[in-house]
Amino acid sequence: MNDLEEIVYKHALLNAAKHKGSANPGAVIGSIMSQEPDLRSRAKEIGPIAGKIVAQVNKLSEDEQSAQMAKYHVEVKENKQKKEEGLQELPGSHDNVVMRFAPNPSGPLHIGHARAAVPNAEYVKRYGGKLILRIEDTDPKRVFEPAYDLIPQDLEWLGIKADEVYYQSDRFEIYYDYARQLIEKGAAYMCTCDGATFKELKDNCKPCPCRDNSVEKNLELWDKFDQMHAGEAVLRVKTDINHKNPAIRDWVAMRIVEETHPRLGNKYRVYPMMNFSVAVDDHLMGMSHVLRGKDHLANSEKQKYLYDHMGWDVPEFIHYGRLKMEDIALSTSKALEGISSGKYSGWDDPRLGTLKAIARRGIQPQTIYNLITEIGVKMSDSAISWKKIYGLNRNFLEPIANRYFFVENPVEITVDGYEDGAVDIERPLHADHEDRGNRILPFAGKAYLASEDVKDGISRLMDAVNVDIDGDKITYNSTSFEQARDLKAKIIQWVPVEDNVNVSIVMDDASTKTGLGEGALKDLKVGDVVQFERVGFARLDEIKDNELVFYYAHK
């Protein structure tokens, strides 16, 4: 037994112990993917091994399994008080797990979209399954054409790669075929009632006259459907006209749309409604599990009628609670309106909650991925805030961000009485990573200070000199750090007069801080994240002429 087989064997024994001696291959794979992150890249290799080893373990008696657990030091750890968090095990079969992320192309993705994308991707990774990206673009009014390219880019930033990609606008002929099949089964009918009449009948649990049309009559109307005007007719799926929820009673599957579609032009006029196209595609694409918000509970029930009419197996529907976004602007329509009016500079304006905006600020993709994974999939509502995001992101930035000086609204000062001549002051790029080396800050009695730091009293220019500030007069006091401490001197940053660069920092409220940074910043590349001491983390966004433009992340 090689090392990989031994790991699989231990997980199989543990799973068997939890399930009366019977291990499940999918659950074993899921356990490995969850607890052995280094092996996730070998999921396809692990699958066949797990199947073989689980079969071996299941042939053992429970006593034999216990003996093997003792031999391999496998223990069942019980912790009933453990708080439920993270992604719990998927219900149902874990064989051939197929899941999907299915956004509307109304704009780029924001944190709310990650709520759906991340769990689907993570579950597929855990169980060695397949992830489908399906662009649900069957409502021309909700299509923002650039989103066709923006959505895959955002998923790539999150580290999510779909195994297959589909566009619902490419699948109209498929929807037409299944609509006709429903009519032929007597499970759908063409309804020519006006909306108000149908609503009154539906609200009173009464069928409309069209419900009793013959199959032949419905097919005749179906064949003429694309010649009708919007609102003249719809195709309805038969459900229960007495259902307690009026929205589920004979819901609309197809309607006329007269708007021009960005991808289709005016090729089609008969458009599927979401519940119809989604159910057809989920069946044809082999979805094993469907994750959706609890606001889709009624839609899941609607779609089950279609599954029943067609004799299809129903996937595992899993619903999760709302994700409340405290102080995070997420509305795509409001963002687009703000961009059009000039309120926002674009989809990556730092005030927005789009993935592009937070990436521009130096928020790491793993921060968002881990945050959503930690929230998990549960019916109770959850809340996130910038404070929570910043706390997680700080863990990623602390070890990678080198430290630099920046002074806002710089004031050049001369230290009277300084006689030590020119010196090069060395400060580490990162105190915890000496291997990265030092920055050199030349000092010869002159420096730039932030205007807010030029205040009367004793101050220490960090690692340089102690000075006495009295109005416009700045006098040398000493060099000793111990003396600065005894004098309770204020420690302030400074930037060399001899070696500096113009810096602007776009803040999270879109305001801009301008000033000077030390010369070592010139070695940075766009995309690098730094920590400006006493200011916070920031990502280099642009290098232009003699100016570096950063976007502020957080403290």
From Swiss-Prot:
One of its GO terms (biological process) is amide biosynthetic process. Keywords: Aminoacyl-tRNA synthetase, ATP-binding, Cytoplasm, Ligase, Nucleotide-binding, Protein biosynthesis. Its EC number is 6.1.1.17. The keyword Phosphoprotein does not apply. SUPFAM superfamilies: Nucleotidylyl transferase (SSF52374), Ribosomal protein L25-like (SSF50715). GO terms for molecular function: ATP binding; glutamate-tRNA ligase activity. It is an enzyme of class 6 (ligase). Pfam families: tRNA-synt_1c, tRNA-synt_1c_C, tRNA-synt_1c_C2. PROSITE patterns: AA_TRNA_LIGASE_I. It is found in: Cytoplasm. It catalyses: tRNA(Glu) + L-glutamate + ATP = L-glutamyl-tRNA(Glu) + AMP + diphosphate. NCBIfam families: gltX_arch (TIGR00463), PRK04156.1 (NF003169). Belongs to the class-I aminoacyl-tRNA synthetase family. Glutamate--tRNA ligase type 2 subfamily. This is Glutamate--tRNA ligase. It comes from Methanobrevibacter smithii (strain ATCC 35061 / DSM 861 / OCM 144 / PS).
